[in-house]
Amino acid sequence: GRAFLGIGPGDSAVYNLGLRGARLEQMREYIVAVRELFTRHEAQYQGRTARLTWPQRRVPVYMSAEGPRSLRLAGQVCDGVVIGLGLTPELVRDAIEYVRQGAREAGRNPDEIDKWWLVKTNVSDDPRQALEESRMALAASANHAFRFTLEGKRVPPELADRVERLKREYVYAEHEKLGAERKNARLVDELGLKEYLAERFALIGTADQCVARVRRMAEAGATSLLLTAIGPDKPRLIKSLSDRVLPHFR
C-alpha cells in the first residue's frame, strides 16, 4: 500500500501542555521499537515487551528532521525523512549528506532512504500579499527548525540573535493561525526576518518564480516535496499549483 508512519518529537500539541518534545535518543528508541513491531511483531520498549501480530506487511517509518544530528538519525534508523532544514541549494545538499552519513554509519544503503522536503507554499500573482499571508507559517518553520540549536544549520551570524528571540517569544497557542494581528506573524516583521525565512523555508511568489525555485532545488538533489498550502484561500492555491506549477515537473 501507500501508507507510511510519520514520527516527530512533538510540536505545538506537546508544548501547549507545558511538556517538552522528545529528545533524539528517545526518538531512536521509539522508532527502532516501532520498526521491530512491523518486522518481528515484537519489540522491547522502555523495559517492556510490546507485540503487534496483525500487520500483513511492513509499514515504512519516516521521521521529521531539521539539523545534522536528527538527519543522521533518520539515515540510521528510518525508511524516510521529512526535511525541515531549508530549501536553498546549499541546505538541500547539506541535508542529503547528513542523511547519507547516518546511513553509512549504520551500514545501510544511503540511496534507499526516501527524502522529502517540507515546503510552505503560496503561489500568487501578488507575491507581496502572498508573503504577508505566510508570515505565521514562516515563524512556525523557524521555531521548529531552530528550537534546540542553531549549530550546523547555516544561520547567518548577524541574524542569530533575532532568531533566538523568535524562539523565546513564539506563541504556541497561536501556532500557524492566520491573521495579521497574530503574535507570531508580527514577530517575523518586528525582527526583520520575513525575507530570510521566506527564502529559506517557503515557495512563495508567482507561478514562474515557484517553478524556478523548484528547479534550483532539483538541481541540488531534491527529488520529493511535501507542499503545505498557506493562506486563506486554499482551493485557489491548490488549483494554481495544479494548473501552473506541477505541469512543469510531470
Q: What positions do the PLM features span?
A:
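Short, flexible active-site-proximal loops enriched in glycine and acidic residues
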Residues: 1-9, 39-45
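Hydrophobic faces of well-ordered beta-strands that scaffold small-molecule active sites
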Residues: 3-7, 61-65, 81-83, 113-120, ...
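Glycine-rich phosphate-binding active-site loops on the catalytic face of alpha/beta enzymes
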Residues: 7-9, 83-91, 141-151, 229-230
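A short acidic, helix-capping loop that chelates divalent metal ions and anchors anionic groups
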Residues: 13-18
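An alpha-helical appendage that flanks or caps ligand/catalytic pockets
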Residues: 20-52, 92-219
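Well-ordered beta-strand positions
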Residues: 36, 79-80
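Structural motif
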Residues: 76-77, 220-222
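Short acidic, glycine/proline-enriched helix-loop-strand junctions
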Residues: 173-186, 233-250
